[in-house]
């Protein structure tokens, strides 16, 4: 039966999803004979071989991935690029117990530190490379938390648009608890600045449900965290982190304002509950001291 290129690609993708590797590999070899210069056919065929996790199949996977790199200009899928293909080759090398080769590829292909967790994991398997592993893992942990923070804020924004206040509260509370487990107690650091935003969002959720006492307590915590951070600003990633082992002096940053207290102002200004939040914020400032306006 004649099969089009599009049908062949779809069937290869289905084999990847269904994990039908043996049948998938046989099918891949058939369509590769017909479409040897089609990027999608070559790439998804390589992926089928790689998914087998069988060391004997990895050389063929690598061969096909390398061929896919030669055809990369045909690629139209946003989630696939030269970096993802190189990572695929590295994974194949891991299955072949060629760990050093895998690490070398991952290091060369480590744009914005995206492979730090992969490199750290592989290095951690060798006792002699523990120090280097911890350096990569430390950087990966900080990057992952930063990404997680922004992901959760994105969720909170989306749930806010949906008027799903309970989910906003749940995900922000979970994020704040997760962050608190990663830091040393009583050490002021960049996570205090992050908490200012989280506490202010939680105040917003309470005020939207007419829980003014709850909103007061969250704004009080936001104020305390902001004043603590602004008194001794520290953006260094290594400050106060439980599991940080890197020697560099990397720093965190955001676009929420010059001071932590400005974060409270920015969130209130953008809130649909601005009037009520400002009334309670004024009360917090009057009762605890400090300026209402930033």
Regions found by a protein language model. Give the residues of each.
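Helix-turn-helix repeat elements of alpha-solenoid scaffolds
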Residues: 14-26, 53-67, 90-100, 123-135, ...
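Generic helix N-cap/helix-start motif at coil->alpha-helix transitions
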Residues: 3-9, 37-42, 77-86, 109-118, ...
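Flexible helix-coil transition and linker loops at the boundaries of alpha-helical arrays
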Residues: 28-39, 67-82, 104-107, 139-149, ...
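Alpha-helical segment of the N-proximal tetratricopeptide repeat
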Residues: 6-40, 44-56, 88
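Residue at a conserved register position within TPR or TPR-like alpha-solenoid repeats
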Residues: 15, 49-52, 93, 123, ...
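TPR/TPR-like (Sel1-like) alpha-helical repeat modules
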Residues: 64-70, 110-112, 142, 169-180, ...
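Short coil/turn linking the two alpha-helices of tandem helical-hairpin repeats
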Residues: 46, 50-55, 76, 124-128, ...
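"A position-specific structural signal for the A-helix of alpha-solenoid helical repeats
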Residues: 10, 44-48, 88, 118, ...
